[in-house]
Design a protein with these regions (language model features):
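Acidic, surface-exposed loops and disordered segments
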Residues: 1-176
Length: 176
């Protein structure tokens, strides 16, 4: 699986979208709490507004890196994907972030198995969980008591991915 950052404008077919969502819904979670909520956005205007608002927020960041992302006119936080899946987590569950990460990974792998491109996008939480972005919680119908954790940009690949970068060596040791 590789991150896709160039998408065709064609919308993901409904059956494929449902298969991706089902993979997320069936992800493992601590004590089977399933502390996630998925919000599917396919309205280009909302996706673009989220990106623009993220960039405006990023330009105010104390982090040089985040500020540079916000200042990049060509950057789109969702890489112009036609579908975005926002993944929010129940704030009362101590493992919500990790459980939601498992759901995201399942969705990414399912998408790839069907030839659909995807990219894990965490930046958007920087906006949604800020005072400037909290109105999105209501607009996107994120349930009360949940906060934005991860998101997935989803769509058909515009380009074939290049060869993957080398993996770090010595990432595994064995004790037998």
């Amino acid at each position: 699986r590789r991150s896709t950052r160039a998408f065709l404008p064609e919308q993901v077919r409904e059956a494929e979208l449902q298969a991706v969502l089902e993979a997320g819904i069936y992800a493992p979670s601590a004590t089977n709490q399933q502390p996630w909520h998925f919000t599917v956005i396919q309205k280009k205007g909302i996706i673009d507004r989220l990106s623009d608002d993220f960039k405006a927020q990023a330009r105010k960041s104390e982090s040089d890196y985040i500020r540079s992302v916000g200042e990049n006119e060509k950057f789109h936080v969702f890489y112009n994907a036609p579908t975005v899946i926002m993944v929010s987590g129940d704030q009362s569950r101590h493992s919500a972030a990790v459980d939601c990460a498992a759901a995201v990974q399942n969705m990414l792998i399912q998408a790839e198995s069907m030839g659909i491109g995807s990219c894990w996008v965490g930046f958007i939480a920087y906006l949604i969980n800020s005072p400037e972005g909290e109105h999105y919680l209501k607009e996107l119908e994120i349930p009360e008591g949940f906060k934005q954790i991860h998101s997935v940009a989803l769509g058909y690949k515009r380009l074939k991915p290049a060869n993957p970068p080398a993996r770090k060596e010595n990432a595994v040791n064995y004790i037998r």
